[in-house]
Regions:
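Conserved post-catalytic alpha-helical subdomain immediately downstream of the catalytic base
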Residues: 210, 215-222, 226, 242-304
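Short beta-strand scaffold segments in enzyme catalytic cores
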Residues: 47, 92-96, 228-232
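Short acidic, glycine-rich surface-loop motifs adjacent to enzyme active sites
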Residues: 131-144
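Glycine-rich phosphate/adenosyl-contacting loop at the front of the ribokinase-like
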Residues: 1-59, 245-247
Length: 305
């Protein structure tokens, strides 16, 4: 395992989940409970790794009172982080959860970063990068940051002897692939958007992933929800999934946990893919976006399809 897995989350958040008995538009809805946690895709990868004893450090822009709160939340979980100071405040995302498990989300757009702040974010990653380390670039890009941010960073990480994993969407994902990351982790919708079609069958998914692999040289790890995940890399394509039904508590953060699991272990691709699906499964079983420790029970249910 590499010395430290770095993550960079250009648009992190403080996530507040409110439990409401019911949700009525235009009325006063009273919450009977609230839960606050640090969030953002890269932050979640680092949290998952830290919870399983794997060294990871989150690099993120932090500004405003919300940024101070984000720091405190990370420190409460003993998550190692590098704060890049920015002028505008970190965003707050609100989730409203009804007893039937349905979640309604309202996400703030987040800060506008200056060119200098975006550059400082990239420089902070490179300053903490050791040879052979993984860097995970994850999530949406905040306003003010070029769509080429991940592509540029991937290239710089590669030239510095590191390995870059990309987990984003839209233009940031499409353009990010130009930086030839070592790994990309789209979900089904993101892969479909990337390859310009619908992907109704597993064969379609494998064909689309192979197309991305062929055109970019990047290994492709596709998260498929209850169908597990596929990996298209150097060797034959692989598919791992859970062999029996799993009680779903929350799908939030499952893809982030899956990516964390893949990066947490060394060994043959099939072993890493099985570990990835085990971590994703642990996340789905947990009501929070953070799964906590992955157990042998989580691993036992994963089969190579």
């Amino acid at each position: 395992v590499s010395a430290v897995i770095l993550t960079v989350t250009p648009n992190p958040s403080v996530d507040r989940t409110l439990d409401v008995a019911s949700l009525v538009a235009g009325a006063v809805n009273r919450a009977n409970g609230a839960h606050v946690e640090p969030s953002g895709k890269g932050v979640n990868v680092t949290r998952a790794l830290a919870a399983n004893g794997v060294r990871s450090r989150a690099v993120l822009p932090i500004g405003g009172a919300e940024g101070d709160q984000l720091r405190r939340l990370l420190e409460e979980e003993s998550v190692s982080y590098v704060a890049v100071p920015v002028t505008e405040p970190v965003r707050v995302n609100i989730s409203l959860r009804t007893p039937d498990g349905v979640v309604t989300k309202v996400n703030e757009p987040g800060p506008i970063l200056s060119w200098g702040e975006a550059d400082a974010l990239a420089e902070a990653v490179l300053a903490h990068l050791g040879h052979g380390d993984w860097v995970v670039g994850a999530g949406t890009l905040p306003r003010g940051v070029s769509d080429d941010f991940y592509a540029d960073l991937a290239e710089r990480v590669r030239l510095a002897g590191g390995r870059f994993a990309l987990d984003s969407s839209g233009a940031a994902l499409r353009k990010g692939l130009a930086g030839r990351p070592a790994l990309v982790k789209p979900n089904l919708d993101e892969l479909a958007e990337l390859t310009g079609g619908t992907l109704p069958t597993l064969d379609d998914v494998l064909t689309a992933a192979a197309k991305v692999r062929r055109t970019t040289g990047t290994d492709v790890l596709v998260s498929l929800g209850e169908e597990g995940a596929v990996l298209v890399g150097d060797g034959p394509p692989l598919h791992a999934r859970v062999g029996k039904p799993v009680r779903v508590a929350s799908t939030v953060g499952a893809g982030d946990n899956l990516l964390a699991g893949f990066l947490a272990v060394n060994g043959p691709p099939a072993h890493r893919l099985r570990e990835a699906v085990a971590w994703g499964t642990a996340a789905v079983r947990s009501p929070r976006s953070l799964a906590g420790a992955v157990t042998d029970d989580d691993r036992a249910v994963v089969v190579l399809a």
